[in-house]
């Protein structure tokens, strides 16, 4: 299943250029860019992501899974849907980038209660900034962040930065795995 996801990502979501031409969230330019949405929002990609994320969190005894909108939303929703299919339902939640300015003011949207154990997910990590922001906001709302799962680790220190806040942090796919598959597909 993992290799199928890697191949799917290479076909739908991975971009390379000879010169650094892709602007990252950090503002830095890169030769390597991954936009996971075309993969995750495809029915087969959603199935693969959901099941692989659930495999990564199955021992954590979680109540919820989510992260910073928009990158984490399809990952969390795929995992929540897969959790129901697997007979171990976990609720999805989304963390706002800006606080809601009306109604009940909160960062976390979804049916989450203070004290519940959650995993924070993200689609891609470079520096870890977005994932760390999600972890901090989840904790500020009283959630216990027990695990962090990243779909694609660019292997630029982000996963290690996340692990400073959540020691049980892992990635489903690494940049090295994508590069290896990309090179095989190009032959």
Swiss-Prot record:
Q: Name one GO biological process term.
A: 'de novo' UMP biosynthetic process
List of residues binding orotate: 126, 154
The EC number on file is 2.4.2.10
Q: What residue range is the signal peptide?
A: none
Entry binding sites for 5-phospho-alpha-D-ribose 1-diphosphate: 96-97, 100, 102, 122-130
Q: Report a single Gene Ontology molecular function.
A: orotate phosphoribosyltransferase activity
User: What Pfam families does UniProt report for this protein, alphabetically?
Assistant: Pribosyltran (PF00156)
What is the reaction catalyzed? orotidine 5'-phosphate + diphosphate = orotate + 5-phospho-alpha-D-ribose 1-diphosphate
User: So, what pathway does this thing act in?
Assistant: Pyrimidine metabolism; UMP biosynthesis via de novo pathway; UMP from orotate: step 1/2
Cross-referenced Gene3D superfamilies:
3.40.50.2020
**InterPro entries noted in UniProt:** OPRT, Or_phspho_trans_dom, PRibTrfase_dom, PRTase-like
- UniProt cross-references to HAMAP family, sorted A to Z: PyrE
Q: How does it assemble?
A: Homodimer.
What is this protein identified as?
Orotate phosphoribosyltransferase
- According to its UniProt entry, this protein's organism is Desulfatibacillum aliphaticivorans
- The encoding gene is pyrE
């Amino acid at each position: 299943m993992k290799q199928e996801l890697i191949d799917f990502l290479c076909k739908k979501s991975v971009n390379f250029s000879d010169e650094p031409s892709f602007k990252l969230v950090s503002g830095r330019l890169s030769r390597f860019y991954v936009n996971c949405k075309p993969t995750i929002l495809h029915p087969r990609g959603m199935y693969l992501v959901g099941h692989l994320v659930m495999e990564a969190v199955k021992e954590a005894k979680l109540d919820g899974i989510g992260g910073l909108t928009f990158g984490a939303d399809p990952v969390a929703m795929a995992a929540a849907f897969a959790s129901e299919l697997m007979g171990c339902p976990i609720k999805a939640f989304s963390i706002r980038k800006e606080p809601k300015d009306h109604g009940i003011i909160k960062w976390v949207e979804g049916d989450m209660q203070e004290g519940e154990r959650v995993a924070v997910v993200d689609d891609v990590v470079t520096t870890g900034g977005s994932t760390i922001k999600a972890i901090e906001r989840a904790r500020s709302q009283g959630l216990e962040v027990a695990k962090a799962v990243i779909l694609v680790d660019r292997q630029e220190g982000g996963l290690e930065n996340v692990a400073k806040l959540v020691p049980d942090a892992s990635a489903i796919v690494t940049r090295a795995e994508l590069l290896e598959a990309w090179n095989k597909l190009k032959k």
